[in-house]
Amino acid sequence: VPGRFDYLLHANDLLSKIEGRRARMLDIGTGASLIYPLIGTAAFNWECVGSEVDKEAISYAKGLIRMNASMLGTKIRRQEFKSNILPGIIEKKEQFDLLVCNPPFYKNKSEALAANARKNKNLHGKEQTHHNFGGSANELWYKGGEEAFLKKLALESAEYGSQVHWFTCLVSKKEHVRTFKRFIRKGNPTDLKVIEMTHGNKSSQ
């Protein structure tokens, strides 16, 4: 949670002072925990919309909203097509001040399993026979991995430039930043920033 809060703090710094209304945030791949809408609502009083492809995650997320009075205005939209990120989620003439996204890290389940095994070995000195993932399949892997997801998001964002003031995304691997920037520039953005975040032994951009 601290790392996610740091991300939203940096994102909040990008927003111009908004008067007379709540800022609107779109969370891509919000997951069952709704962590970004939870933080966005509690810490910044944002109006939040989350997108998700997994039906079970959506059901659980809607349950969280019903149990939390401060989040009753939060909306969850299902992405019907896994090949899309933004189409079908951002409605015509709809405006968002901010988009946030924590993309899938891995290309497939095998890559995720291997990374999890390395992590356990580094932490415990041996490989564990069980696998404990901190997220669902949709949150952890995407065909082509993080780099492919970033390319897709960059290209799709160009189609919604008049509807979203700031597109933001965490990038876990430094080597992907250059690729991401190259594809973002194809859409002729008004501004482009790379902000380094460090929490513990982890670094993100």
Residue ranges and their predicted role:
Residues G200-Q205:
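Helix-rich interaction surfaces within compact, conserved domain-sized segments
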Residues V1-I18:
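S-adenosyl-L-methionine
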Residues V53-K55, M67-V194:
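S-adenosylmethionine
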Residues A61-K62:
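Conserved SAM-binding loop
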Residues A32-W46:
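Conserved SAM-binding loop of SAM-dependent methyltransferases across substrates and taxa
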Residues G20-A32, V49:
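Conserved class I S-adenosyl-L-methionine
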Residues I58:
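Mixed-charge (Asp/Glu-Lys/Arg
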Residues G20-R22, N45, Q95-F96, V164:
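A general structural motif
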